Amino acid sequence: MSDSDIPDPAQEADSRSPVSSGSGGIPATLRALKHRNFQLFFGGQLISLIGTWMQNVAQSWLVYRLTGSALKLGAVGFAGQIPVFLFAPVGGIVADRFNRKQVVIGTQIASMVLALILALLTLTRIDVWQIFVLAALLGIVNAFDIPGRQSFLVEMVGKEDLMNAIALNSSMFNGARIIGPAVAGVLVAKIGEGWCFFANGISYVAVIAGLFMMRVPPRTYRPPVGSPVTHMVEAIRWVWKTGPIRALLLLLGLVSLVAMPYTVLMPLFADKVLHGGGQALATFLKARDLGAVRLGVLMGATGVGALLGALTLASRTGVRGLGRWVAYSCGGFGVSLILFAASRNFWLSTLLLLPVGFCMMLQMSSSNTLIQAMVPDEMRGRVMAVYSMMFMGMAPFGALMGGALADRLEAPLTITMGALAAVAGAIWFGSQLPKIRVEARRLIVAQAAAGGEPSEEITARVVEE
């Protein structure tokens, strides 16, 4: 950590405590926002994520417009996410060994540069292979960004508000998921994909500026003994022998592999599968490309549901009962996807994506919260790297498999098959809950006690109803 990141006592108190004496009036749902550092992160990241979602939608539509192939859509998804599976362990080691704030600044600058290059190529003349290369490079950046950013949250708010910070972070992500796709759908239909990529590049300025303005207190850090490979193997072994975390990550990996590819196939639904809606909206917006408008609406609907799910989690003050939430939300995600795949009406499908997004976000955020509550701080970056491998690292295999199956079996049947597997996973996880709950309670109490929480408060937050 550099000297510029070590605040004096007054600065440290200001950055990790309420921003004013009146901050006690902040609603419990927003309590992490009493921390100045999290305020800076939240505001900048919200702007940046709107740009990110604009790029995600525009890139999918660009690939589909250039190729018309579900397999190529899946292949670009594979190229963009497989680096997370391969390099997230390295990213986790970096997050545990180096200044996490500086790591996140570096990844945000790299992402900005890649977005601007994609914009320049698209506004001139772009080939599909260039999209593949840039997607893969962004995936490498994400392999360092995700564990760094996830483990940096605790330094912004402390362990006492970590659960709320995770939930608000998810709320921010999905608030952007509503705005970004809607804006992208209109921009793509009116002026093309390149300007969406350019807007994303500029949006990174907000989060980078916020990170530079933070005053982060130094974290307690024990110098590592042994090689980085040894440390990563140690973390993987710890995850595997820790039953609750192993079960959460296996379920998360299953869903990412078989059910999450629905997002990759969304351009096909917008253009070929769904009918009977969107024409009036496209006419009102004076948009030439009805498919792009539909895609923006569908992705935005998922974001609305996911935002509601994240806000539901943010309203909680403890981890009690989250295991049940994981099981129920995973099952609900699968059932909602089955209904979506069966629909052929655009507006009905848009409505069905609300519970899809809601349940998806509840499972992801509840799993993240439970894992972070159980993991020791000195292993947080590496364990979150394993989380990234299961959450984002399995997705590329699912995207490639989903694209190939959709070319052979059609997109609706592909999604239905994956959704049925997600329901089966939810049933399995629910059957393991009694055993999971006992060990999870022990781990959460141990970590909370290590953070200095009174035993009666820990019991109130952890013991199942």
Language-model-detected regions and their locations in the chain:
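Alpha-helical transmembrane-bundle signature of multi-pass membrane transport and export proteins
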Residues: 2-465
